[in-house]
Amino acid sequence: MRFRHKAAALAATLALPLAGLVGLASPAQAATSATATFAKTSDWGTGFGGSWTVKNTGTTSLSSWTVEWDFPTGTKVTSAWDATVTNSGDHWTAKNVGWNGTLAPGASVSFGFNGSGPGSPSNCKLNGGSCDGTSVPGDAAPSAPGTPTASNITDTSVKLSWSAATDDKGVKNYDVLRDGAKVATVTGTTYTDNGLTKGTAYSYSVKARDTADQTGPASGAVKVTTTGGGDGGNPGTGAEVKMGYFTNWGVYGRNYHVKNLVTSGSADKITHINYAFGNVQGGKCTIGDSYADYDKAYTADQSVDGVADTWDQPLRGNFNQLRKLKAKYPNIKILYSFGGWTWSGGFPDAVKNPAAFAKSCHDLVEDPRWADVFDGIDLDWEYPNACGLSCDETSAPNAFSSMMKAMRAEFGQDYLITAAVTADGSDGGKIDAADYGEASKYIDWYNVMTYDFFGAWAKNGPTAPHSPLTAYDGIPQQGFNTADAMAKFKSKGVPADKLLIGIGFYGRGWTGVTQSAPGGTATGPATGTYEAGIEDYKVLKNSCPATGTIAGTAYAHCGSNWWSYDTPATIKSKMDWAEQQGLGGAFFWEFSGDTANGDWWRHRQRPQVTPAVRTTRRH
């Protein structure tokens, strides 16, 4: 799909408050409490504007203030106002000037600066105390508790025990962390975690909190696998998998966040999420959007668990919200998807050394900051030995299978490895261009992109459904339908239960159309909310309801506009067909296109459906 990937995400970022406000509260003096709040006020690419606000939250006057913080190497203050700002290397100090040092209770003052570089402040102190309110000068945080031991392990529960932490003022309680996210706070040194999934691996650690509400470092981690279970997540016949791709750029203009999976009810029904996208460049897997992925701060009302991010926590953004989602729904497994329509141009260089490429992907997926978030990897190369946004003219015929073989060797058998693949079933088309049959030995399943067969990139038409299940009289291109694509994959030796059918939460359309049935002429793409020629299902179901069906999908003629999209009824017919064919299930693109109450999920008819969110693209 021609969604706005990096460029659009950045543009949307610039249109929003880039950093938001991150509260950094701290008792600044024994008798006077104060908070320091940082905000990035602007960003022009090579530099940014920032401000700090100091507020007296205590009951007595504050006579002076000093704010300290660290910037990463390469980020610095270039000019400042309303404070005296100095630095020693990467450590920066701002002190009040003569007129703004005294703050009455409830009063606040701000100072600003311009900076260069991409970094954000860390290790903040206000008048010697920590800016997040967890310490006061002269008061030490508690020590780390002992590494927990696990006992009484069942299909759904485990008992944890640990040795006590020490503190100069006494320990108040302990936070129990499952896979990095807090699941309980207890006053003793034991805890039984219930409601787990059988045959599933978890990691537990503990943090102590003292009577001054300071939190100490985490204990060592103990790994626990519940009893029971099956084959570790491989879908087999597909009856188990209910997957969805979540897009990192959706947090901008679409305002769709991980918490929406909870409020829509989708999280109650899915088993897998593909997180899209990481980039492929320089022969390596790389981060796609660092701000959305792990830096964006979430307020309490935006957060999955209702707890706001702090300015100095080691992981924020979507990755941390996904971690919280897994804590709330421990059955959900998450895969990191790399490439996509926009970022597939790096694959030809990467597969020149498949082992090195696979290692780079493993190192990124298993980065210690988020190693507990991801359970596998999805590769979305569009397309090996063929053309997508760019053309692959250098890869060997076996490049795709060599890549997947290297991925399996690097990640091992305990990780899920999947791939998004073309649905071009035409003679000599994209399926014929790569060795998908050989590669299927190393993957858990293929997400076959059975949509975007036709669209308004052919601005004058003919109008045609973008996701036909079968061929029909007058179809513009033979082989551009789901049935032909699946038949061709099977002929290449791909097992049917490793093939997932793709369905979009959107429609494609033209304007200037007078003919109701498919095959009409047009003058160009219809207007869409985010992109011409494409619109979310949640909009189309009301603005242009379906007026007919063809080849197992729906279409609508409204005024001069003509749209095609799937409805709950056509979804059911496709699921019936997929079951008859022995396919592994289905996936959907993408979560933000669904209604606020998860309309697709409420109408989902069969347990083998594998809803995923994929980017759509031309075949």
From Swiss-Prot:
UniProt signal peptide: 1-30
Residues in domain GH18? 240-619
Q: Where does chitin bind?
A: 312-313, 339-342, 383, 449-452, 589
- For the keyword Hydrolase, the answer is yes
Q: Which GO terms describe its biological process?
A: chitin catabolic process; polysaccharide catabolic process
* Compositional bias annotation for Gly residues: 227-236
Q: Which domain of life does the UniProt lineage start with?
A: Bacteria
Segments passing through the bilayer = none
Keywords tagged on the record = Carbohydrate metabolism, Chitin degradation, Chitin-binding, Glycosidase, Hydrolase, Polysaccharide degradation, Signal
* Stretches assigned to the Fibronectin type-III domain: 144-229
| EC number of the protein | 3.2.1.14
Where is the segment annotated Disordered? 212-236
Catalytic residues, per the record, are: 382 (proton donor)
Summarize the record's induction comment: By chitin.
Which Pfam families does the annotation name? Answer: CBM_2 (PF00553), fn3 (PF00041), Glyco_hydro_18 (PF00704)
Into which EC class is this enzyme placed? hydrolase
What is the protein name stated in its UniProt record? Chitinase C
Q: Which organism is it from?
A: Streptomyces lividans
**Gene name per UniProt:** chiC
